[in-house]
Amino acid sequence: MSTIAVIGSVNLDLVATVKKLPEPGETVTDAELSRFPGGKGANQALAAQRLGSDAKLIACVGDDAAAVEAQILLLEGGVDLSGVQSVADLPTGIAMIAVAPSGENHIVVAPGANRALTPDVLSVPVADALICQLEVPVDTVAAAARSFDGFLCVNLAPAMHVDVEILQRADLIIVNEVEAGWYGDSLSAASGMIATTVGAAGATITKNGEDIAFAKPPRIEAVDTTAAGDTFTAALTVALVEGQ
């Protein structure tokens, strides 16, 4: 069994299921509202745990009811939450998600306590692999990259400027096709593998500009694509660490 540490976000997702995603300036009034635990870090940790790994989450939440609700599935799933810190002066992160019948979504995140996971409070555990993403301060990701000696996966989402040291240190970088376009040629600084997901078309893995793998998923009827990328990130990391 592999041990997977995840440094990342914990959110409470407010999901509005709509018949059609609104256009800019448009209001839709037919939504059905649901609440779910979420956050890229939480999603990745839970996925790794469900895939048979021993997962530990390092994160920050608020001292509020949303924090309890956001961690329910993690607790039930057996994820080690000893690295989750509660902060008094910021609320738990909230993600507002609109989902269309096709499964496509629009997401807006209010990070709240996720911003409190700064390098000075960071404790990087011993693990076979570490997964990071960018819903926590990028300085924290850089600090983790410097101090962690094992397999490092960095999900460069949401897209933003990152130090070249992160690109050079990561054994695996994961982006979707939109993020890959945003980063452009800067990804050429990466020394490890780059996995680019292209939705229903699958994913390509490259290294040093050369394609080394391609996976095309089976056709299914999409219900909700929320957290699909997070699940892929966890699954690929677990598979590579365990030599699958």
Question: Model-derived features: where do they sit?
Answer:
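Conserved phosphate-binding/catalytic region of the ribokinase-like
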Residues: M1-I4, D185-Q244
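Short gly/ser/thr-rich secondary-structure transition/capping motifs
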Residues: P111-L117, C153-A159, A215-P217
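Short beta-strand-to-turn element immediately C-terminal to the catalytic PLP-Schiff-base lysine
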Residues: V99, N176, T204-N208
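Glycine-rich phosphate/adenosyl-contacting loop at the front of the ribokinase-like
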Residues: M1-C60, A65-I72, A222
